[in-house]
Amino acid sequence: MMKYILVIDHIATGGAERILIDYYHYLKQNGHVPYVFVLSGYSGQSKWTENVDVFYGSCNDENNLIKKTLQQFNLFFRLKKIVADIKPDVIFSFLEKSNLLTILVPTSAVKVVSVHNVLSLQYTKIKLGIVQKLTYCMIRWMYNKCNNVVAVSKQVKDDLIVSFGVRSENINV
C-alpha cells in the first residue's frame, strides 16, 4: 500500500481533472491511499469530488498580482504541511501552478508532474517581454529540476524541449 497526493489547480470539467479523478479511483481500487490537494476551490463545488479525500488550498483565485503572489506562498506552506503530515510515497501533479508547488515542496516522495498543453502557445498571451522571459525561465528551471515529467503528447514534449530547453531525458510521453 502506497500513499499518493494528487495536486491540481482546480477541479472543473477539463481533461486534466478527469484524469486526476480516474487515477484517484484507480489507486483506491488497487489498495493504495490517495488524497487530492486542490489549489483553489471548496467542498461541494464539483460533483466529481464526491467520495474523494480532498484538501483545498484556498476558496478562490486572486486576480491582483500582489494578492496572487501571497496566495501562492500560502498554498506552498499548506501543501508543505499536508505532505509532512501524510508522508506520501508519490506526489503527482497536473497543470503549471500545481507542478511548480509540487517541485518546490521539500520531500523524499517521488514527484511526477504532468504537462497537458503546448505551453509556448498558451503563454503567447503574455505581452510584456520581461514577464514572458521570466515565465520561460521559470518553466525551464522547473521541468529540468524534476526527472519525472509526463507530457500528454509528442507535440507537448517537443515544445518543452525546443521552446523551453527542458532536457529530453526528463520527459516521458
Whereabouts are the PLM-identified features?
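A short, charged, and often flexible helix/loop element on the N-terminal side
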Residues: 53-78, 124-131
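Proline-aspartate-enriched helix->loop->beta-strand connector
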Residues: 83, 87-89
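N-terminal strand-loop element at the rim of the active site
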Residues: 6-14, 18-67, 156, 164-172
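Short His-centered aromatic/hydrophobic patch
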Residues: 75, 93-99, 115
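Membrane-proximal helix-turn-helix segments that form the acceptor-binding/catalytic region
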Residues: 77-81, 130-149, 165
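Extreme N-terminal starter segment of soluble prokaryotic enzymes
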Residues: 1-5
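Active-site proximal beta-strand in glycosyltransferases
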Residues: 90-92, 106-123, 150
